């Protein structure tokens, strides 16, 4: 159990059988009446954000999350097979469980898998990955003055906007959080 007075950004709590992460919190002490804590909570499974108010000192169950590092080994049909690097056990996750950053998964890549009561809540991929460009339009000389971009397909199949000077076969660094080009590797 955790008191509402101890809420901090990132604290995980359990409400109605679901895990919620505190995104924002504000302790309010009105001139008349008792103090309360106004929060914005994000559902760890669905990503929905709701506002909820707690009385000051109210206790709620704290969700205990387990974090383990798994290595992506291969894709089997619609499932992605991960191996626990400590126990060498294999586990399967679907693309829906991994989220929209699944397009950056490359064999041998490590990911942090967060579980609660045996359920996978979230899969955290690295913030940046280095991938090879396998398909893009050739850069035309003189096009770089405007600082334009062009689409490029990388080895995992993801589509990324890259500067005009990038060509097929180059290795580029990509930010997986916002699908942006970070630089050459």
Curated annotation (Swiss-Prot):
Keyword field: Cytoplasm, Elongation factor, Protein biosynthesis
Parts forming coiled coils: none
Gene Ontology terms, MF aspect: translation elongation factor activity
Main localization category: cytoplasm
UniProt keyword Mitochondrion, yes or no: no
Top-level taxon in the UniProt lineage: Bacteria
Any Gene Ontology biological process: peptide biosynthetic process
SMART domains, alphabetized: EFP (SM01185), Elong-fact-P_C (SM00841)
The protein's annotated pathway: Protein biosynthesis; polypeptide chain elongation
Subcellular localization(s) per the UniProt record: Cytoplasm
UniProt-listed InterPro entries: Elong-fact-P_C, NA-bd_OB-fold, Rib_uL2_dom2, Transl_elong_fac_P/YeiP, Transl_elong_KOW-like, Transl_elong_P/YeiP_cen, Transl_elong_P/YeiP_CS, Transl_elongation_fac_P
GO CC terms, sorted: cytoplasm
Similarity annotation: Belongs to the elongation factor P family.
Function per UniProt: Involved in peptide bond synthesis. Stimulates efficient translation and peptide-bond synthesis on native or reconstituted 70S ribosomes in vitro. Probably functions indirectly by altering the affinity of the ribosome for aminoacyl-tRNA, thus increasing their reactivity as acceptors for peptidyl transferase.
Name of the protein this chain belongs to: Elongation factor P
Organism: Synechococcus elongatus (strain ATCC 33912 / PCC 7942 / FACHB-805) (Anacystis nidulans R2)
Lineage: Bacteria, Bacillati, Cyanobacteriota, Cyanophyceae, Synechococcales
Gene: efp
